[in-house]
């Protein structure tokens, strides 16, 4: 079986933990992860001034698709940049139309709203993004730490990054694969 493929879209202002933890966990699970810079291949300044080097530009990554999952990290500025990008919209619309998994964390789900993705789904966000996400009646809201509704997987924030990442692994590769990755991490149950 071919290995699963993930696209993580990295925008200026992305939340570091919500980017790096899912990338790390998915790679531990054998998922081929591409970290794509929204603005190109140059290092990206994240929300806490950590610089992350993307693997490639989003334009180049788009040509290498399709992906089994598209991941949107949070961070207020990062989510705003994702929300304003026509390329992100195109990728998300294509992912939704081909029934591929879309995963977003913290403020990241607001990009789903901006691009009209997953309307009717139950979602969660960072508490600070709830009002924005619920503007209109496009989604139902959950206070769960991770919420999966069909092919839309959302989570709350930096403190839920491991759970979010493991939920992506489980959705793509099964519970056994997620459990194998989780075991040596010494996570609190």
UniProtKB/Swiss-Prot annotation:
N6-succinyllysine: residues bearing it: 182
InterPro entries reported in the protein's UniProt record: Class_I_gatase-like (IPR029062), DJ-1 (IPR006287), DJ-1/PfpI (IPR002818), Prot/Nucl_acid_deglycase (IPR050325)
Modified residues (Cysteine sulfinic acid (-SO2H)): 106
Lipidation, S-palmitoyl cysteine type: 46, 53, 106
Cell compartments where the protein resides: Cell membrane; Cytoplasm; Nucleus; Membrane raft
Cofactor note: Deglycase activity does not require glutathione as a cofactor, however, glycated glutathione constitutes a PARK7 substrate.
Keyword field: Acetylation, Autophagy, Cell membrane, Chaperone, Copper, Cytoplasm, Endoplasmic reticulum, Fertilization, Hydrolase, Inflammatory response, Isopeptide bond, Lipoprotein, Membrane, Mitochondrion, Nucleus, Oxidation, Palmitate, Phosphoprotein, Protease, RNA-binding, Stress response, Tumor suppressor, Ubl conjugation, Zymogen
Modified residues (N-acetylalanine): 2
One Pfam family in the UniProt entry: DJ-1_PfpI
Quaternary state and interactors: Homodimer. Binds EFCAB6/DJBP and PIAS2. Part of a ternary complex containing PARK7, EFCAB6/DJBP and AR. Interacts (via N-terminus) with OTUD7B. Interacts with BBS1, HIPK1, CLCF1 and MTERF. Forms a complex with PINK1 and PRKN. Interacts (via C-terminus) with NCF1; the interaction is enhanced by LPS and modulates NCF1 phosphorylation and membrane translocation. Interacts with NENF.
UniProt protein name: Parkinson disease protein 7 homolog
Gene name of the encoded protein: PARK7
